[in-house]
Regions:
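Thiamine diphosphate
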Residues: 1-182
Length: 182
Protein backbone atom coordinates (compact mmCIF):
# COMPACT_ATOMS: atom_id res chain seq x y z
CA UNK A 1 0.00 0.00 0.00
CA UNK A 2 1.48 3.34 -1.01
CA UNK A 3 1.50 6.45 1.17
CA UNK A 4 -1.35 8.90 0.64
CA UNK A 5 -0.60 11.65 -1.85
CA UNK A 6 -0.85 15.29 -0.84
CA UNK A 7 -3.62 17.21 -2.54
CA UNK A 8 -3.76 20.85 -3.57
CA UNK A 9 -5.97 21.30 -0.48
CA UNK A 10 -3.31 20.03 1.94
CA UNK A 11 -0.58 21.91 0.09
CA UNK A 12 -2.57 25.18 0.38
CA UNK A 13 -2.99 24.65 4.13
CA UNK A 14 0.72 23.93 4.51
CA UNK A 15 1.62 27.11 2.60
CA UNK A 16 -0.84 29.06 4.75
CA UNK A 17 0.83 27.82 7.93
CA UNK A 18 4.23 28.91 6.59
CA UNK A 19 2.71 32.31 5.81
CA UNK A 20 1.39 32.58 9.37
CA UNK A 21 4.84 31.82 10.76
CA UNK A 22 6.37 34.72 8.80
CA UNK A 23 4.93 36.96 11.52
CA UNK A 24 7.32 36.56 14.48
CA UNK A 25 4.45 37.11 16.92
CA UNK A 26 2.60 33.99 15.71
CA UNK A 27 2.15 31.07 18.08
CA UNK A 28 0.42 27.79 17.29
CA UNK A 29 -1.49 26.09 20.10
CA UNK A 30 -3.44 22.85 20.29
CA UNK A 31 -3.53 19.13 20.83
CA UNK A 32 -1.19 16.92 18.88
CA UNK A 33 0.61 19.71 17.06
CA UNK A 34 4.11 19.24 18.46
CA UNK A 35 3.66 15.48 18.48
CA UNK A 36 1.92 14.23 15.34
CA UNK A 37 -1.49 12.81 16.03
CA UNK A 38 -4.10 14.33 13.74
CA UNK A 39 -4.20 15.38 10.10
CA UNK A 40 -3.82 19.08 10.92
CA UNK A 41 -0.37 18.46 12.37
CA UNK A 42 0.78 17.35 8.90
CA UNK A 43 0.39 20.97 7.74
CA UNK A 44 2.96 22.31 10.21
CA UNK A 45 5.75 19.78 9.83
CA UNK A 46 9.13 21.48 9.72
CA UNK A 47 7.94 24.72 11.30
CA UNK A 48 9.64 26.01 14.48
CA UNK A 49 8.55 23.88 17.45
CA UNK A 50 9.57 26.63 19.86
CA UNK A 51 6.57 28.64 18.61
CA UNK A 52 4.12 25.79 19.25
CA UNK A 53 2.34 25.02 22.50
CA UNK A 54 1.18 21.45 22.92
CA UNK A 55 -1.93 21.27 25.11
CA UNK A 56 -3.60 18.31 26.77
CA UNK A 57 -7.22 17.54 25.98
CA UNK A 58 -8.49 20.71 27.68
CA UNK A 59 -10.34 22.61 24.98
CA UNK A 60 -11.69 25.41 27.17
CA UNK A 61 -8.26 26.00 28.70
CA UNK A 62 -6.75 26.05 25.20
CA UNK A 63 -9.21 28.77 24.16
CA UNK A 64 -8.48 30.73 27.34
CA UNK A 65 -4.74 30.48 26.67
CA UNK A 66 -5.33 31.59 23.07
CA UNK A 67 -7.18 34.67 24.31
CA UNK A 68 -4.48 35.45 26.89
CA UNK A 69 -1.67 35.09 24.37
CA UNK A 70 -3.55 37.37 21.97
CA UNK A 71 -4.03 39.95 24.74
CA UNK A 72 -0.25 39.80 25.30
CA UNK A 73 0.33 40.76 21.65
CA UNK A 74 0.65 37.42 19.89
CA UNK A 75 -1.16 36.27 16.78
CA UNK A 76 -2.50 32.88 17.79
CA UNK A 77 -3.46 29.98 15.53
CA UNK A 78 -5.52 27.64 17.70
CA UNK A 79 -6.06 24.09 16.41
CA UNK A 80 -9.31 22.18 17.02
CA UNK A 81 -9.32 19.01 14.89
CA UNK A 82 -13.13 18.75 14.93
CA UNK A 83 -16.13 20.90 15.77
CA UNK A 84 -17.01 18.45 18.55
CA UNK A 85 -13.87 19.59 20.38
CA UNK A 86 -14.55 23.28 19.81
CA UNK A 87 -17.97 22.82 21.42
CA UNK A 88 -16.10 22.16 24.68
CA UNK A 89 -14.58 25.65 24.40
CA UNK A 90 -17.90 27.35 23.63
CA UNK A 91 -17.98 29.36 26.87
CA UNK A 92 -14.60 30.99 26.21
CA UNK A 93 -15.39 31.41 22.51
CA UNK A 94 -18.87 32.91 22.79
CA UNK A 95 -18.68 34.80 26.09
CA UNK A 96 -15.08 36.02 25.95
CA UNK A 97 -13.31 35.90 22.57
CA UNK A 98 -16.38 37.13 20.68
CA UNK A 99 -16.98 40.01 23.09
CA UNK A 100 -13.49 40.96 24.29
CA UNK A 101 -13.13 43.99 22.04
CA UNK A 102 -16.48 45.38 23.23
CA UNK A 103 -15.83 44.46 26.89
CA UNK A 104 -12.45 46.25 26.80
CA UNK A 105 -13.86 49.30 25.01
CA UNK A 106 -11.62 48.52 22.04
CA UNK A 107 -8.41 48.16 24.06
CA UNK A 108 -8.03 44.46 23.22
CA UNK A 109 -8.68 43.13 19.72
CA UNK A 110 -7.62 39.49 19.99
CA UNK A 111 -5.90 38.19 16.86
CA UNK A 112 -6.90 34.54 17.07
CA UNK A 113 -7.26 32.27 14.05
CA UNK A 114 -9.23 29.17 14.95
CA UNK A 115 -8.61 26.17 12.72
CA UNK A 116 -11.45 23.70 13.07
CA UNK A 117 -12.09 20.55 11.08
CA UNK A 118 -15.40 19.18 9.96
CA UNK A 119 -15.08 15.50 10.78
CA UNK A 120 -15.01 12.94 8.01
CA UNK A 121 -16.79 9.63 7.60
CA UNK A 122 -13.84 8.24 5.61
CA UNK A 123 -12.13 5.83 5.89
CA UNK A 124 -14.37 4.86 8.82
CA UNK A 125 -17.68 6.38 9.83
CA UNK A 126 -17.39 7.49 13.48
CA UNK A 127 -21.15 7.49 13.94
CA UNK A 128 -23.05 10.51 15.17
CA UNK A 129 -20.16 12.34 16.76
CA UNK A 130 -16.99 13.84 15.33
CA UNK A 131 -18.30 14.54 11.83
CA UNK A 132 -20.82 17.35 12.13
CA UNK A 133 -20.39 20.87 10.80
CA UNK A 134 -21.62 23.37 13.38
CA UNK A 135 -20.76 26.47 11.33
CA UNK A 136 -24.36 27.67 11.15
CA UNK A 137 -25.04 27.03 14.83
CA UNK A 138 -21.94 28.88 15.98
CA UNK A 139 -22.53 31.58 13.39
CA UNK A 140 -25.89 32.32 15.01
CA UNK A 141 -24.22 32.78 18.42
CA UNK A 142 -21.10 34.71 17.39
CA UNK A 143 -21.64 38.38 16.58
CA UNK A 144 -18.05 39.48 15.92
CA UNK A 145 -16.25 36.37 14.66
CA UNK A 146 -16.63 35.49 11.00
CA UNK A 147 -16.71 31.83 9.99
CA UNK A 148 -15.25 30.91 6.61
CA UNK A 149 -15.72 27.45 5.14
CA UNK A 150 -12.60 26.31 3.30
CA UNK A 151 -14.45 23.90 1.03
CA UNK A 152 -11.95 24.18 -1.82
CA UNK A 153 -8.18 24.57 -2.08
CA UNK A 154 -8.63 27.90 -3.87
CA UNK A 155 -10.25 29.48 -0.81
CA UNK A 156 -7.50 28.61 1.67
CA UNK A 157 -4.65 31.04 0.97
CA UNK A 158 -6.96 34.07 0.44
CA UNK A 159 -8.75 33.26 3.72
CA UNK A 160 -5.49 33.09 5.65
CA UNK A 161 -4.20 36.28 4.01
CA UNK A 162 -7.43 38.00 5.07
CA UNK A 163 -7.08 36.62 8.60
CA UNK A 164 -3.49 37.86 8.84
CA UNK A 165 -4.22 41.43 7.75
CA UNK A 166 -7.49 41.73 9.66
CA UNK A 167 -7.76 42.61 13.29
CA UNK A 168 -9.78 40.29 15.46
CA UNK A 169 -10.65 36.62 15.62
CA UNK A 170 -11.80 34.37 12.79
CA UNK A 171 -12.83 30.72 12.44
CA UNK A 172 -11.60 28.82 9.39
CA UNK A 173 -13.40 25.51 8.80
CA UNK A 174 -11.41 22.74 7.12
CA UNK A 175 -12.50 19.53 5.45
CA UNK A 176 -9.88 16.90 6.38
CA UNK A 177 -11.22 14.35 3.89
CA UNK A 178 -9.79 16.70 1.25
CA UNK A 179 -6.25 16.44 2.70
CA UNK A 180 -5.42 13.26 0.80
CA UNK A 181 -6.36 11.68 -2.50
CA UNK A 182 -8.50 8.60 -2.10
Amino acid sequence: MSAPQFTPYLNALTESMKLCMEDPSTIFIGQQIVYYGNPMSKTIEGLPKERMIETPVMEETQMGMSIGLAMAGHRVVSFYPRWDFLICAANQLINHLDKLEAMSDGEFVPNVIIRVGKGSDKPLDPGHQHKADYSDEFGSMLKHIPIIKLDSAEKILPAYKKALISKGPIILVEYPEMYYES
